[in-house]
Amino acid sequence: MTSLPGRGVSPSSSDPLCEGNAAPSSSSSSGQDLKQLKNSILSCVFSSPFSIFEAHQDSSANRSLKPHSGSYAWSRFLRRIACTGSMWRFLGASKALTSSDVWFLGKCYKLSSEELSNSSDCESGNAAFLEDFSSRIWITYRKGFDAISDSKYTSDVNWGCMVRSSQMLVAQALIFHHLGRSWRKPSQKPYSPEYIGILHMFGDSEACAFSIHNLLQAGKSYGLAAGSWVGPYAMCRAWQTLVCTNREHHEAVDGNGNFPMALYVVSGDEDGERGGAPVVCIDVAAQLCCDFNKNQSTWSPILLLVPLVLGLDKLNPRYIPLLKETLTFPQSLGILGGKPGTSTYIAGVQDDRALYLDPHEVQLAVDIAADNLEAGTSSYHCSTVRDLALDLIDPSLAIGFYCRDKDDFDDFCSRASELVDKANGAPLFTVVQSVQPSKQMYNEESSSGDGMDSINVEGLDGSGETGEEEWQIL
């Protein structure tokens, strides 16, 4: 994806760090100049709300100035400190960005240094947000891996962004499941076996459970192929097929040969491309968990993928507040979406801007062995936060949620139902207890249906893989 331009910056600004200037002009060599320079630098760092977003400089702002020697030495010293490591990401030209709350995968962060909330749902501090962001698994274009299937493709550059975005979302689900939402990437080795094992699953070879190779193979019937771009609905179905295949063949995924949670793909119609509000059916989710637990009545963790079509050529503005609110759910796994033709992994929101991890960076393929706790993992993490106007998101997208247990799922359903009440007749998705038997379509191995909830689900489908069965409501 192309870089976003800088916003709200005057090229005539005199601040040496925020504008990228080396130092002020040498027209005055007095000590007052040095004092003003120090105050300006410190003001840039401390007085305004930190900017945690990637700053893009206008070339016109980089003027060639001849500094006073003392001032220049001081500015270089502070610049070296401030622009080394992650600290530089709090500086930059994006002063137009507000100090509003950031919601990131169900957590709220206060970016303002003033009026800190007493709410237990909010965490204060830019550093805390950046640590959370940089701990998320970042999966990008890779090159130099073994050819995909019978093709000659050894790289997914320019076509694999939807696959990579979906891998990021599922990777977060596995992190939340095995390590918890509060997990942060350790600063020292050896790493935990769970963390390394998750990264191994997303390696770029057929030996890795959730590799691009295996996803394309699983999604063949939905149009997935090396060299071709794919939409979010087909991507969700490819995951459904791959998880089912892994379970049937007892491939090593979580140590027991299974994906460690049930998977429920919910969509609004048969092909997922004509729109219609998806229906999350509680009885279907319960059946999926039962099948996952080999017909035991206990509830299992469950991953919900909800592909949506929220407009024709552009996102219908009425859905924007609803999309933003899904990112406040504790169960949130983010959104597969981005500008048309350029998928990203949207994991947060501030005001009218989506915050995302970008898969469009090309990196060499790496092989992380499942038992190598000293492996280098830096290529799977990114501390550059990118943002995108919400109204520029492609209307075809998918939302993910992870529910750890029955109470967590009930909480999700409660929040989703409240969201329906705010939708003014156009919800993202709805929640029902059961579905009408006459509206269900089963495959040849399917069993009979459940009772009908009061809501009319004609023309909608809620499908999820139930062991060897697939549920569809048409």
UniProtKB/Swiss-Prot annotation:
It catalyses: [protein]-C-terminal L-amino acid-glycyl-phosphatidylethanolamide + H2O = [protein]-C-terminal L-amino acid-glycine + a 1,2-diacyl-sn-glycero-3-phosphoethanolamine. One of its GO terms (molecular function) is cysteine-type endopeptidase activity. Its EC number is 3.4.22.-. Residues 1-32, 439-474 are annotated as: Disordered. It comes from the Eukaryota. Residues 439-449 have a biased composition (Polar residues). GO terms for cellular component: cytoplasm. It is an enzyme of class 3 (hydrolase). The active site is at C161, D358, H360. It is found in: Cytoplasm. GO terms for biological process: aggrephagy; autophagosome assembly; mitophagy; piecemeal microautophagy of the nucleus; protein processing; protein transport. Keywords: Autophagy, Cytoplasm, Hydrolase, Protease, Protein transport, Thiol protease, Transport, Ubl conjugation pathway. InterPro entries: Papain-like_cys_pep_sf, Peptidase_C54, Peptidase_C54_cat. Its main location: cytoplasm. It holds the Pfam family Peptidase_C54. PANTHER family: CYSTEINE PROTEASE (PTHR22624:SF49), CYSTEINE PROTEASE ATG4 (PTHR22624). Interacts with ATG8. Belongs to the peptidase C54 family. Cysteine protease that plays a key role in autophagy by mediating both proteolytic activation and delipidation of ATG8 family proteins. The protease activity is required for proteolytic activation of ATG8 family proteins: cleaves the C-terminal amino acid of ATG8 proteins to reveal a C-terminal glycine. Exposure of the glycine at the C-terminus is essential for ATG8 proteins conjugation to phosphatidylethanolamine (PE) and insertion to membranes, which is necessary for autophagy. In addition to the protease activity, also mediates delipidation of PE-conjugated ATG8 proteins. This is Cysteine protease ATG4A. It comes from Oryza sativa subsp. japonica. The gene is ATG4A.
